[in-house]
Amino acid sequence: MKTLIIAEKPSVGRDIARVLGCKQKGDGFLHSDEYIISWAIGHLVSLKEPDDYDPALKKWKMHDLPIIPTEMGLRALPKTTKQLNLLKKMLTSKEVSQIICATDSGREGELIFRYIYQWANCKKPVKRLWISSLTDAAITDGLAKMKDGREYDNLFASARCRAEADWLVGMNATRAYTIKCGELLPMGRVQTPTLAIIVNRHHEIAAFVPEKYWEVKATFVTENGEAYTGMYFASAHDTHTGQMETVGDAALGVPLVNDDMTGNGTPRAASPTKTAGIHLADAETRIPSETIAKEIAAKVKDAPGKVESIETEEKRQLPPQLFDLTELQRECNRVLGFSAQKTLTIAQALYETHKMITYPRTDSRYLSGDMAPKLKPILESAPAPYDALAASLLAMPTLPTGSRIINDAKVTDHHAIIPTGSKKPLSALSADEKAVYDRIMRNFLAVFHPAYVYDVTTIITIAVEERFRSRGKTDRKLGWKAVYSHEKNQKNDKAEKDSEDVVLPPLIQNQPVTATDTEVLHKKTQPPKPYTEATLLSAMEHAGRFVEDEALKEALKQSGLGTPATRANMIEKLISSEYIKRNKKSLIPTEKGIRLIGIVPPEMRQPETTGKWERGLSRIAAGELDDTKFMDSIRRYVTYLVGEAGKV
């Protein structure tokens, strides 16, 4: 008797076969005296189409909606029927006594296997291989730790409910609104609220009315001829308070809610640097009147002044955390200009083909405790140009692995993306593959480095009772930034953006200076920026920010809109459906996309719906919710959607 192992893809099947010594080749499988190893090619089985239930449903008619089958059936995908029939033959073979499910370790991988198993009407016992890397060591370890397949029944129930709910909502909503509007309008649980996020930003930009403001910059020169610049700011000592009741966005008719106030307009607790009792917020440099700005500039020009105060504050910036897929996609979009889909495709190749990184479709940024002994060997195998950085870490008495790196409570189906320690030469990679591998390797190296430490020096200069602020930044310890020192634009430069970064000469308090020049800067408030793929991925991941209900906010905090593995495809689907288009790095809604969001009911375009679903699916996976109750609620929702479409 033999054990049948079913992988998700041929390449994974061949990796497992290599470890188990299965060298005999068949048509669509490998085998030995003990094992038969075959594979799916992604999904081989899908849910039936409406016309599979009733041929009359091939034509889209409003009176046929909603389409809610009593029991959802399966159909073979035509392009892969040959492989499906082979697997069915193997699953039902008397030669096979046990099955090992070796599809991807996650909800979708579980669904792929279970649909094939169900299609073949197989009842044989199943073991589950659950791994996060395709190295020989990881596969061997996984085979030794397999669990009974029944332990994943709840995961399958969650996956099946997700697939059936997506089918019911997508199929019925798409047909209903397409029929009513006379143009093809694909819709979906994740697709439509994602489109709404982009459309809402478009409306915010269109409705934005820029407000003018002015700033005054002065050049100060010491008695030794050393020059530096400073920006005028309003303060408690300001002589113009009678004319400028407030300075900043609020004075310009725009509530200052992003940085210095809470969402309800209440001022936040003071956090800016204080000097001589003065709060130094960026908004205080804004002057709402050109006349006042010119008066200040004229008054200060050529006037004597002095350095009123000097304050140096040490700041620290922690290293980045390890990548999950979404963060890797954001990074590659920001640094390399890659689309989310391109990054996913390359990461998948680095995982499957080259075996150089761990499973990429993860939503965790942490490692499990059992990974700790494997970290030094990975560093020891780091190729040039990373070997010198790795050597400095290996020289430490112990590798720092705090809770920001190793945290069992925050590891989901798979741990964060890290290198595997493969000895494969970088020359085997394409240029794009090298670029993505570089981001992953440097991220892995950076997390073990200490914080980046720097000083921010704030100087207040006073001239004829007007105050000017100058800031400069000085590196003290590069820490993790040394990993990125070769890059012109440093990674994650929030620290730099927090300062004005002028070059400051050596100065002492009360040192006399002269304002040799002043300049009035004409500026205006800026609208929100269109989404890029990087910022849209963030919005999808943190969709709970758009939700008020705390329970739903928490559900979306855990899952967001879509999954790391599906978000890239969702962006591409919105583009192919002609709902959005790329404009350089920006994602812009089309008229068609704007039109759709204008007619669908709020429940279809708001993330709350997905929050409810994801909370339900998570409870099903945890064994806390009956899947029948979940599907009953979906059927009621579909009936409501069709009714709302009829009102358009």
Regions found by a protein language model. Give the residues of each.
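Intrinsically disordered, low-complexity regulatory segments
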Residues: 1-163, 167, 284, 527
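Metal- or metallocofactor-binding catalytic centers and their adjacent structured scaffolds
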Residues: 276-321
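C-terminal helical "lid" subdomain and adjoining coupling/linker elements of P-loop NTPases
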Residues: 180-186, 198-247, 261, 274-289, ...
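Basic, low-complexity terminal or inter-domain segments flanking catalytic cores
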Residues: 2-4, 26, 80, 91, ...
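Conserved short loop/turn motifs at secondary-structure junctions
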Residues: 1-2, 102-105, 182-186, 312-321, ...
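C-terminal or mid-to-C-terminal helical accessory/interaction module adjacent to the motor/catalytic core
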Residues: 72-79, 85, 94, 134-220, ...
